[in-house]
Curated annotation (Swiss-Prot):
Residues 160-327 form the OBG-type G domain. The keyword Cytoplasm applies. Its main location: cytoplasm. Disulfide bonds: none annotated. One of its GO terms (biological process) is ribosome biogenesis. Keywords: Cytoplasm, GTP-binding, Hydrolase, Magnesium, Metal-binding, Nucleotide-binding. Monomer. SUPFAM superfamilies: Obg GTP-binding protein N-terminal domain, P-loop containing nucleoside triphosphate hydrolases. This is GTPase Obg. It comes from Chelativorans sp. (strain BNC1).
């Protein structure tokens, strides 16, 4: 199985151009002296976060990126042109790691954010630099320096306002397809969702981004099943929608399994605000519905919302509950930004 949220890429900056060995040749000047120009610098390697990309799939097909070398120096003290840069365009939320996949190089969280990964090699000196009192006509010049090279890992963590979590087949993809324009792959077997799907939810003239995170199983934080890679996707969401399927025999145990995985993974996931819903509720009769909602309320220590993506029951209530948390987080963020700007103005004055 291949995933689109991680890719290993080779990058190389351009070599510097060589300096020129050249002598001034003009009429009536017999010994013109050296006039070899310097070589141009090699191209750099940049990475930039751009709009319109949601996955790293492009880096499955092209994994080697090399900037152009600098142009060699020329006579008449002309410096060679700098080599063309290479810019890796990635989705917002991409993190760049060194080859060990642990050392973070940069984290791109905004559209237009750029980071210089590798600098091109310096150009070599032309022979004009080697003229001295004892050597008026030097026939040597420096070669350009080689460009840097590196293997890097690109890792994408989705930046979504809310994340859908739950065991496989809890009805997450069906819910996402119901409330957004996203078209996730849906089938009745575990791990249908092999990479996260994003959708935009509109409710009461407001909107937020919802991510369908692939199904967790017991031991996911240690890489079991699809692995802990996907727990990383929910790190940046402001609120979690925890779906428990009404088809589960023991809904309380199912709820606790996912909570254990969130706690074991760490990174504050278990402290995030959570909305709990019993999905696929249309499969239950009235008595089963009451029993399972009560058991879930006891396990979660909060009321669980009934939900059916098939009939539409409870969908609006769940979305409004999520929107309230998302809106509160946005207002808190805006207030913090305003306070920061005010403090900055006072510091500058």
């Amino acid at each position: 199985m291949k995933f689109l949220d991680q890719a290993k890429v080779y990058i190389r900056a351009g070599d510097g151009g060589a300096g020129a060995v050249s002598f001034r040749r003009e009429k009536f000047i017999e010994f013109g002296g050296p006039d070899g120009g310097d070589g141009g610098r090699g191209g750099d390697v940049w990475i930039e976060a751009v709009e319109g990309l949601n996955t790293l799939i492009d880096y499955r097909y092209q994994q080697h990126f090399k900037a152009k070398p600098g142009i060699h120096g020329m006579g008449r003290n002309r410096t060679g042109a700098k080599g063309d840069d290479v810019v890796l365009k990635v989705p917002v939320g991409t993190q760049v790691y060194e080859e060990d996949n642990e050392t973070l190089i940069c984290d791109l969280t905004e559209v237009g954010q750029r980071f210089l990964l590798l600098k091109g090699g310096n150009g070599g000196f032309g022979n004009q630099h080697f003229k001295s009192s004892t050597n008026q006509a030097p026939r040597r010049a420096n070669p350009g320096l080689p460009g840097e090279e590196l293997w890097i890992w690109l890792r994408l963590k989705l930046i979504a306002d809310a994340g859908l979590i739950g065991l496989p087949n809890a009805g997450k993809s069906t819910f996402l397809a119901t409330v957004t324009a996203a078209k996730p792959k849906i089938a009745d077997y575990p791990f249908t969702t092999l990479h996260p799907n994003l959708g935009v939810v509109r409710i009461d003239a407001r909107e937020f981004v919802l991510a369908d995170i692939p199904g967790l199983i017991e031991g996911a934080h240690m890489g079991v099943g699809i692995g802990d890679r996907f727990l990383g996707h929910v790190e940046r969401t402001g609120v979690l929608l925890h779906l428990i399927s009404a088809r589960e025999e023991d809904v309380a145990a199912t709820y606790k399994t996912v909570r254990r995985e969130l706690k074991a993974y760490g990174h504050g996931l278990s402290e995030k605000p959570e909305v709990v819903a019993l999905s696929q509720i249309d499969l239950l009769d009235e008595e089963e519905r009451r029993e399972k909602l009560a058991a879930l309320k006891k396990a979660a220590r909060r009321a669980a919302l009934p939900l059916s993506s098939a009939t539409g029951e409870g969908v609006q209530d769940v979305l409004r509950a999520l929107m309230r948390v998302v809106q509160a987080a946005r207002e808190e963020e805006r207030a913090a930004e305003t306070a920061n700007e005010r403090w900055q103005k006072q510091a500058d004055s």
